[in-house]
Design a protein with these regions (language model features):
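Alpha4 helix (beta4-alpha4-beta5 surface) of REC/receiver domains from two-component response regulators
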Residues: 69, 91-107
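Acidic catalytic/metal-coordinating carboxylates
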Residues: 40, 66-69
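Acidic, metal-coordinating helix/loop segments flanking the phosphotransfer/catalytic sites
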Residues: 37-55
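Conserved acidic segment of CheY-like receiver
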Residues: 7-18, 23-27, 56
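C-terminal output helix
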Residues: 113-122
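The feature encodes the CheY-like receiver
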Residues: 62-63, 93
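Short amphipathic alpha-helix used as the core "switch/output" element in two-component signaling
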Residues: 68-81
Length: 126
């Protein structure tokens, strides 16, 4: 029997490879082997529109557009509006968490986070 998430494809979008690669590896370990990567918001949008994905995990520090603007574009899009969107922040008191939640964020993590934090968030979303 395959893991419950083995068919779900998640896009990890972060301008820093040092952030993306460990997260992709962790997703594979948790049963999401189909993760893909983007280094900016426009690349993320292109990938999301060209290949089916069930989720996006991104940094609010994306560029062109930033993470919050990307989230808003996704929620306004008829083809992407139901995509599960998660973000990770550096500070629990970050005002961006409130803005992103109001814009339709499905879940978030605060750095540094542990494997079980990511697993709990993904389980709650799916």
């Amino acid at each position: 029997m395959s893991p419950p998430y083995s068919s779900k494809k998640i896009l990890v979008a972060d301008p820093l490879m040092i952030q993306r690669k460990p997260l992709v590896h962790l997703l594979a370990k948790l049963g999401f082997p189909l993760a893909s990567e983007a280094e900016n918001g426009s690349q993320a949008l292109i990938l999301l529109k060209s290949e089916p994905h069930e989720g996006l995990i991104c940094s609010p520090h994306l560029e062109n557009p930033d993470g919050l603007s990307l989230l808003k574009r996704i929620r306004e899009s008829p083809e992407l509006g139901k995509l599960k969107v998660m973000m990770y922040f550096e500070d629990e008191d970050d005002d961006k968490i409130v803005s992103a939640t109001r814009a339709g964020l499905d879940g978030y993590l605060v750095f540094p986070f542990q494997e079980n934090n990511l697993e709990t968030m993904l389980t709650n979303i799916w």
